[in-house]
């Protein structure tokens, strides 16, 4: 399997952008969209963040097999006119790896390569405690089996697990795709009572994102 790098770029929009003439904003948004679409070796999914998380206005969820190209294309976006009004507020990086705990993945797991995205994407950086890694493998597997069983009860919710060990501050980036946020919240509440929960060191900040076609997401910035 080719190495797949996954990057979540959260942008903060300079308020000065909204004071530009409407026609100029529309033109410059098109320039930015063309720069995204021109990076043909990278898959990009767009999410407008307006009103969803303070300090964030746009998420680009990107993945590709060449980290240098991910970096170069991000730089090209920053060089567009709109890009000069966008500061990176948060950035998370990792790899897709075969899970240690799941023998055979279902369509719920590792949905990163799907072309159709869910309406809602919920993302958070995640790190386990040191004590978790000092447990025996069988003990960890047992707790993960409980976690996985709960997840499979919510079959309409898809998960992407990105491994960040040694590449970023967190150990994982966890992303869920859902059509019903009430259902997703029920999943989270149920997972809170599993045994593995006590070995969570951190799982914030949490980002709730709304998927839109790229040009629609940019239009909401206008």
What label would you give each PLM region?
Residues 1-2, 42-56, 78-117, 157-168, ...:
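Glycine-rich beta-strand-turn "strand-cap" elements at beta-sheet edges
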Residues 1-37, 67-69, 89-153, 165, ...:
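Short S/T/G/P-rich N-terminal loop/turn motif that feeds into the first structured element of a domain
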Residues 4-6, 56-58, 119-121, 170-173:
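Short, surface-exposed beta-edge/turn micro-motifs
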Residues 11, 48-49, 59-65, 125, ...:
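A structural feature that tracks compact, well-ordered secondary-structure segments
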Residues 16, 60, 69, 81-82, ...:
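A broad "ordered helical/assembly scaffold" signature
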Residues 32, 72-80, 186-192:
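Short amphipathic alpha-helices in soluble, non-transmembrane regions
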Residues 32-65, 69-70:
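Long, hydrophobic/aromatic-enriched structural stretches that serve as scaffold segments
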């Amino acid at each position: 399997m080719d190495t797949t790098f996954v990057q979540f770029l959260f942008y903060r929009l300079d308020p000065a952008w909204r004071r530009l003439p409407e026609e100029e904003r529309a033109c410059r948004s098109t320039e930015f969209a063309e720069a995204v679409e021109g990076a043909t070796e990278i898959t990009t999914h767009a999410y407008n963040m307006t009103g969803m998380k303070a300090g964030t206005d746009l998420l680009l969820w990107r993945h590709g097999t060449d980290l240098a190209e991910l970096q170069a294309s991000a730089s090209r976006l920053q060089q567009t006119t709109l890009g000069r009004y966008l500061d990176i507020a948060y950035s998370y990086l990792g790899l897709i790896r075969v899970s240690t705990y799941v023998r055979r993945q279902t369509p719920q797991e590792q949905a990163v390569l799907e072309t159709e995205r869910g309406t809602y994407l919920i993302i958070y950086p995640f790190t386990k405690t040191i004590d978790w890694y000092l447990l025996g493998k069988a003990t960890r597997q047992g707790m993960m089996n409980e976690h996985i069983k709960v997840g499979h009860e919510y079959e309409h919710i898809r998960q992407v697990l990105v491994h960040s060990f040694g590449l970023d501050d967190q150990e994982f980036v966890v992303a869920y795709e859902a059509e019903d946020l009430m259902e997703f919240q029920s999943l989270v509440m149920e997972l809170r009572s599993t045994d593995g929960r006590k070995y969570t060191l951190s799982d914030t900040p949490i980002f709730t994102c709304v998927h839109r076609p790229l040009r629609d997401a940019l239009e909401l910035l206008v």
